[in-house]
Amino acid sequence: MFEKNTKPLICTTVKGDNADGFIAKMAELREQGTDAFLLRLEYLLPENRTEETFRKIVAGAQGYPTYATDYRRFDKYANEDDECKAEALLAAARAGVDLLDVPGNMFTNETFELTHDPIAVAKQRKLIDEIHALGKKVLMSTHVDWYLTQQEVLDIAQAQQERGADVLKIVTMSNTAKELTDNLETTRVLNETMTSSILFLSSGDMCRLHRMAGPYLGCCMWLATFEAGRKDQPLLSDLKPMLEKFENC
């Protein structure tokens, strides 16, 4: 799962403030045809961010592949430092989550999500090694709210790969037709250049085609949502039948 050169998965976001909320939503999404779950652990109430809770959530996934985040920037409680978040990722790995998201700026206060601070990079490498020792995989993520050139994307991906990431996630912008077509080409080049799996996405006014076509050019998954009104992520209930029709036409 999430391997390079294997069939891409439809991975759908799941949120909740407790295990029961996650489990109920996963049951709905299984009925709609998801292949995997993106577990947004940062939405859990602080008292529910425990290995016991994570085990309940993983059990509720019923064997479907799981990918988990604990993003500081989306944590509305904002009461955990990165050392705590590292412990949460390790607890999630012990609980059985398959793929853990390590942000590229973890262990720093930097806003750009790829630090080159040597102390922080050493901590990231150590965390990645610890997750690997538990038999799990690591995705390293870098999100920006501007357009990145192909060379900038390749440089970020190379740094993520050198730190030990199994999946290289980079999110840029597609606000014009030129940016969109550049990003499609960059997806192909990334897949041909990197040995790790890739998840290269964009947001912005013209991002939808990149999101939809990326897995046909090498991305390891489609990201879907259950929340209507998002331009950057399609509803699972729309995406699943559309892909089936496209692949059978």
Where are these regions (language model features)?
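Active-site beta->alpha loop and helix N-cap motifs at the rims of alpha/beta catalytic domains
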Residues: F2-A133, K137-L139, D145-Q150
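Catalytic alpha/beta core domains of metabolic enzymes, predominantly
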Residues: G104-C249
